[in-house]
Amino acid sequence: MKRRQQGIRTGMPFMANVAEQTFTDDLRRRVYLAKPARRVVSLAPSVTEILFAVGLDAEVVGVTSFCDYPSQAKTKPKIGSSIPNLEAILGLRPDLVVGNKDFIRPDALAKLEQLKIPVFILSPKTVEDILGHISTVGRLVDHDKEARLVGQGLRDRLNDIRSRMASVKPVRVFYVVNTDPLISVGAGSFIHQMLELAGGENVVGRTAAPYPKVSLEEIIRKNPEVLLFPVGTMEGIPETEQQRWRKWTSLSAVAHNRLHQVRAELVNRPGPRVIEGVEVLARTFHPAMFPRSTGG
């Protein structure tokens, strides 16, 4: 269960004074860089995707064992999983470590600070936070132009989705993060906003907690029209657990065979592919708004 939740929670607005190379991360920690980072260690898959998206490759000197995209990330030295190996990080001589709030324990962060290694922490709560983080990371590594281009391209795609979804009636959706205990996404999670942007109505969206525990009775009462299961090699809901939902025949989603899978890395990772995730969700919820083109 912990891995499923960690995979999801891997940004808040940031402030930066470029002249002094002093940045403030999402934990309101001031991070000083004497010069743009040239040796960067990533502590989360979403961070790794952002680093490569803004044009880094050789500069990425270490990643976690969960970092599997893009393909170049698989060849990078590994610094551990959700618990970073401090000795391995130190041996890579980074001038910047970028992580996320839920992928680094407070004691590990404190030790990195004691070693005088600059650590910048992201903690996204909205899709806009994620897009803002691309800009943030671009500034940290002196790839501002590349970051702006990536961000603008993603915003253009998001605006297209908003336009398509403007006239649809939202479908009631239940997103299954975990089954035992039963966990979903609340208003405090960026995934909640993804569901809404895609033309969905999160049936537990009034819950403030980002990843609330819910009861089966509550979900049956709210009668979702779509059941959504993240799947993937690193995380996701096993097929056997998905099929158990079919016995609840009173659910609209079951009665109309609307149990859908979505690639976990497109929804659970707050990185550049999050917009692709929204596109996939929108096509899943409202396929009629995305007619297939026919050759002729």
Show where each model-derived region lies.
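Short, structured coil segments at secondary-structure junctions
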Residues: 56, 74-75, 115-116, 198, ...
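Extracytoplasmic substrate-binding proteins
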Residues: 29-32, 39, 96, 106-183, ...
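His/Asp/Glu-enriched short active-site or ligand-binding loop at hydrolase and phosphoryl-transfer sites
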Residues: 64, 188-211, 229-231, 261
